[in-house]
């Protein structure tokens, strides 16, 4: 259980650490903010590609082995990023890191499941993963100011090494022993995946660009990091809370409330009003996006008890695809007169539109 929480929490730092440092990295590499968005895209290309192989590998060989491979990839990739060898090598390094972050999410959650964790503990795992991303948004900007542009990378490598300790101590966990039937075309899983995309996926897109949005509105890097970090960081509270509520509130109602709340929070950010209004928007978006995590993944595992790891992977892959496509597109919005606000208006609309697949999802 501890190993799963460590793997999920430490390696999801990589999801938002670059977005938190977007402006300094743009200056260092001599590229636009939209190009910096490609560093996140490079990560999520491999993060997406490894989802199903990691899930099937966890089902067949055990989640501990997959987790250790993920940790090794994160360390190697961030070591490459620490080299000052240009933007092209940075893209390669982020792609290697993506193998680690993608496999880590699946393996970490499956470690919790294999250890006997139900909806409440899986919600706690979700909170741990949000902690990593949220803390990166809050800590990396001032740490970069105090040190250098390398801050996102050396911190990520150190956290990956930290996650290795409890993972190496895991023993005796049950595993499925086979990869299960192929889940890619499972029509019952896809609506569940759409809900994960509309909550976690869009929240990560928003979290990656909230800091530069607020900086362009006049906030300091520290204030923007603290406010923008709320989008991911407050999931520490609502993901476990959603797990506790899973047995007390109808899953469909819980997810509907989350979608409406996320849409409202993104809309507040899109308005470009006073800093306090944008901060409230970040808070509301983060609280809402974290709420349905346990409901969504518990439903995925119930749908495919023959391949729980692969089911986790497919549902999360839907969110990763959203991040992969949405992050660079959101970056392009910063080249428009709206200074990025248009991206958050679209996020608000997409969150609300997910009420449609909610009707088809078996929760």
Locations of regions flagged by a protein language model:
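Helix-loop-helix hairpin linking two adjacent transmembrane segments in secondary transporters
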Residues: 89, 117-118, 123-171
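A late C-terminal transmembrane helix in Major Facilitator Superfamily
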Residues: 306-339
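Conserved MFS/SLC helix-loop-helix module at the cytosolic interface between two early adjacent transmembrane helices
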Residues: 49-85
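Helix-to-loop junctions at the C-terminal end of transmembrane segments
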Residues: 50-62, 238-250, 334-335
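C-terminal transmembrane helical hairpin of 12-TM major facilitator-type secondary transporters
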Residues: 250-296
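Extracytoplasmic gate region of multi-pass secondary transporters
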Residues: 18-19, 188-236
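Cytoplasmic helix-loop-helix junction between adjacent transmembrane helices
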Residues: 93-129
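Helix-breaking motifs and short loop linkers at transmembrane-helix boundaries and internal kinks
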Residues: 30, 62, 83-88, 272-273
């Amino acid at each position: 259980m501890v190993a799963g929480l460590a793997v999920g929490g430490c390696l999801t730092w990589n999801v938002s650490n670059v977005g938190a440092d977007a402006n300094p990295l743009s200056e260092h590499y001599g590229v636009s903010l939209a190009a910096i968005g490609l560093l996140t895209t490079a990560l999520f290309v491999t993060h997406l590609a490894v989802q199903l192989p990691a899930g099937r590998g966890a089902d067949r060989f055990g989640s501990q082995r997959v987790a250790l491979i993920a940790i090794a990839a994160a360390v190697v990739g961030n070591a490459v990023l620490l080299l000052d060898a240009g933007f092209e090598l940075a893209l390669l390094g982020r792609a290697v890191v993506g193998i680690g972050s993608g496999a880590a999410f699946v393996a970490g959650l499956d470690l919790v499941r294999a250890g006997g964790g139900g909806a409440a503990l899986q919600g706690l795992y979700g909170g741990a993963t949000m902690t990593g991303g949220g803390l990166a948004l809050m800590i990396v900007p001032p740490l970069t100011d105090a040190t250098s542009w390398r801050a996102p990378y050396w911190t990520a490598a150190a956290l990956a090494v930290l996650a290795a300790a409890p993972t190496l101590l895991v023993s005796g966990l049950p595993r499925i022993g086979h990869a299960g039937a192929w889940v890619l075309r499972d029509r019952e899983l896809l609506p569940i995946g759409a809900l994960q995309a509309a909550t976690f996926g869009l929240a990560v897109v928003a979290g990656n660009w909230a800091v530069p949005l607020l900086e362009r509105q006049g906030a300091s890097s520290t204030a923007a990091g603290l406010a923008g970090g709320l989008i991911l960081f407050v999931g520490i509270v609502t993901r476990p809370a959603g797990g506790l509520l899973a047995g007390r509130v109808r899953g469909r109602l819980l997810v509907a409330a989350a979608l409406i709340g996320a849409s409202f929070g993104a809309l507040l950010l899109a308005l470009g009003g006073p800093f306090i209004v944008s901060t409230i928007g970040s808070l509301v978006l983060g609280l809402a996006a974290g709420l349905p995590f346990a409901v969504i993944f518990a439903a995925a595992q119930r749908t495919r008890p023959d391949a729980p790891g692969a089911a986790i992977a497919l549902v999360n892959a839907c969110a990763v695809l959203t991040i992969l496509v949405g992050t660079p597109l959101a970056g392009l919005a910063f080249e428009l007169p709206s200074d990025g606000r248009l991206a958050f208006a679209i996020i608000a609309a997409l969150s609300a539109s997910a009420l449609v697949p909610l009707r088809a999802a078996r929760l």
